[in-house]
Amino acid sequence: MTLLEKINETRDFLQAKGVTAPEFGLILGSGLGELAEEIENPIVVDYADIPNWGQSTVVGHAGKLVYGDLSGRKVLALQGRFHFYEGNTMEVVTFPVRIMRALACHSVLVTNAAGGIGYGPGTLMLIKDHINMIGTNPLIGENLEEFGPRFPDLSLIHI
């Protein structure tokens, strides 16, 4: 099965569950997974039930997709994500974001637990830039025109 076929199958599965056109995607990392419990009129789907979806193995990641209303907006929240360091391929790591795009979501907020000098527990930090030093990236492989150009403009990614 091609990546596009997997994306279409997963999108169709979620749409059949009532998950449609979220205004915002939330990828909730360690410490913020409970935010999904604030979502009203939730549709909750376990990762294990979603076709082509990876499995979250990090302690504290509930492994659930939650869709509904948060502050009057339709959101799709992911309680946990998949990490490259866990042995996942970039296809698995990026698959949830591709699904959000397939569902017509155009804005995604990614959270994670991070440490640094001068920051205490619970401090919010905003990423302004990044350098990819892992030796691979999700652009390797077939370019899916449905998801944009081969080399997207990243100059405004951290807004």
Task: Label each region the model flagged.
Residues 157-159:
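Conserved small/polar residues in nucleotide/adenosyl-binding loops
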Residues 1-152:
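Metabolite-binding pocket within alpha/beta catalytic cores that recognizes anionic/polar moieties
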